[in-house]
C-alpha cells in the first residue's frame, strides 16, 4: 500500500540539505521516531513549566499513538489526565485553563474529529484576545491533532483539515515534517503567546527516524526552510508530503531538472518572503498537499505568489493535491498526490 502511495516503507531519514538554514545540533542526540520526539517535547514542557497540563482522550494511558507515554506516571494525574469523548468540551476546558495563565496542551485523538470543537477554536480561542482589547488571552492553548493518510484509515481517520483553520486570524497552524522538527516546533508552539493548532502527520509517527537532540530547543515559527536547493522549479509542501516530493525531486534530477524544495512548517501565518524569493529565482512553482485541491491551502499560496511574482513566472502555478472526493479507503492510492503525479507536473511545468 505504501508503495502505491508513492512512499517507501523503509525508515525515513531527513538530512539537513539547506544552505544557511537554521540547524539544530545533534551532538547529544539519539535516533528517535516522530512520536518519541513529540513525547520527549511533552516531557520537557511539563518538566520546565509547572503550569503545563496535558489532557485528552486516553492520554493518561499513553494515547492511541503512544505520544503521551509515561507522562501521567511522572507528573501525576492532576497534570496529565483523560477526558470524555467530547472534543468541544476538551478544547473549551483548554481555553479556560489557558485564560487563567496556564499552558493547556490538548490532544484531539484524530484530526477528523476536530470539527465538533470548531466553534470553540474559531469563535472563542482565536478571538479571545481581540474581543477583550488585549485584556485577556488564551495564548497558552496548544491543540495537538494527528492528521493525514496512513494507508488504511478511510474517511474518518485520514483527513487533512488544515485549510479550515488557515482562514482564522488569531490562531497559528503548524505542521512538522520530521522528528527533529516536531520536537522543536512543538516546544515553540507550547511557549508561543498565541493559541496554536499543531497537526502531526501520523504516517510519520513510526516511519520517520532521525537524530534528535535530547536537550530543550525550539525552532522558530513562521520561518520556512529550503531543504533542497535548485534552479528550475520551486516545490512547496509540509508534513509527510515532503517525503513524497523529495522522491520526485530526485527522479526529476535524473532527467536534468533542478528542483528547489521548501518546507513551509507554519501555514498560519506563513513565510511568504522565502517562497517569493525562491519563485523569483526559478520562475516556476508547484504546491502539493494531501487535502482536496479545491479550497486547499495551496490555492492561497498560489494567489499570493501570482500577486508578488507575476512578471517573473515562466509557467502557470501547478497544484498536485488530493482529489475532490471524501477520503476513500480502497481507492486511497488513486486519491493521493503520489510521486509520479508530482514528477509529471514538474516536467509539464518546466516544459510549458
Curated annotation (Swiss-Prot):
Listed GO CC annotations: mitochondrial matrix
Instruction: Give the stretch annotated as transit peptide in the record, renumbered to this chain.
Output: 1-23
- UniProt cofactor(s): thiamine diphosphate
Residues that bind K(+): 139, 141-142, 189, 192, 194
- What's the name of the protein? 2-oxoisovalerate dehydrogenase subunit beta 1, mitochondrial
* Annotated InterPro entries: THDP-binding, Transketo_C/PFOR_II, Transketolase-like_Pyr-bd, Transketolase_C
Q: Quote the subcellular location field of this record.
A: Mitochondrion matrix
Q: What is its EC number?
A: 1.2.4.4
Source species, please? Arabidopsis thaliana (Mouse-ear cress)
Question: Which Pfam families is this protein grouped with?
Answer: Transket_pyr, Transketolase_C
Amino acid at each position: 500500500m505504501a508503495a502505491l502511495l508513492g512512499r517507501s516503507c523503509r525508515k525515513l531519514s531527513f538530512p539537513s540539505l539547506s544552505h544557511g538554514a537554521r540547524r539544530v545540533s545533534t551532538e547529544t542526540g539519539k535516533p528517535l521516531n516522530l512520536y518519541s520526539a513529540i513525547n520527549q517535547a511533552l516531557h520537557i514542557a511539563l518538566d520546565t513549566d509547572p503550569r503545563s497540563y496535558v489532557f485528552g482522550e486516553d492520554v493518561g494511558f499513553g494515547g492511541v499513538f503512544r505520544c503521551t507515554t509515561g507522562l501521567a506516571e511522572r507528573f501525576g494525574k492532576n497534570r496529565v489526565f483523560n477526558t470524555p469523548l467530547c472534543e468541544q468540551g476538551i478544547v473549551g476546558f483548554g481555553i479556560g485553563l489557558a485564560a487563567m495563565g496556564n499552558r493547556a496542551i490538548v490532544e484531539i485523538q484524530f484530526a477528523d474529529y476536530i470539527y465538533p470543537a470548531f466553534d470553540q477554536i474559531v469563535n472563542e480561542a482565536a478571538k479571545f484576545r481581540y474581543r477583550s482589547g488585549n485584556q485577556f488571552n488564551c495564548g497558552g492553548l496548544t491543540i495537538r491533532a494527528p492528521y493525514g493518510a496512513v494507508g488504511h484509515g478511510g474517511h474518518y481517520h485520514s483527513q487533512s483539515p488544515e485549510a479550515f483553520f488557515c482562514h482564522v486570524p488569531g490562531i497559528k497552524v503548524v505542521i512538522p515534517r520530521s522528528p527533529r522538527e516536531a520536537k522543536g516546533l512543538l516546544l515553540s508552539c507550547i511557549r508561543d503567546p498565541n493559541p496554536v493548532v499543531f497537526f502531526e502527520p501520523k504516517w510519520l509517527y513510526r516511519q520517520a527516524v532521525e537524530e534528535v537532540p535530547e536537550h530543550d530547543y525550539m525552532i522558530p515559527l513562521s520561518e520556512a526552510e529550503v531543504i533542497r536547493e535548485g534552479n528550475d522549479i520551486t516545490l512547496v509542501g509540509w508534513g509527510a508530503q515532503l517525503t513524497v516530493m523529495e522522491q520526485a525531486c530526485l527522479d526529476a534530477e535524473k532527467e536534468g531538472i533542478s528542483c528547489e524544495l521548501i518546507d513551509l512548517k507554519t501555514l498560519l501565518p506563513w513565510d511568504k518572503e522565502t517562497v517569493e524569493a525562491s519563485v523569483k529565482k526559478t520562475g516556476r512553482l508547484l504546491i502539493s498537499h494531501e487535502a482536496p485541491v479545491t479550497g486547499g491551502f495551496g490555492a492561497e499560496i498560489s494567489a499570493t505568489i501570482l500577486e508578488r511574482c507575476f512578471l517573473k513566472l515562466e509557467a502557470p502555478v501547478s497544484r498536485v493535491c488530493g482529489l475532490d472526493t471524501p477520503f476513500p479507503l480502497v481507492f486511497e492510492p488513486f486519491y493521493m498526490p503520489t510521486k509520479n503525479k508530482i514528477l509529471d507536473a514538474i516536467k509539464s511545468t518546466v516544459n510549458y
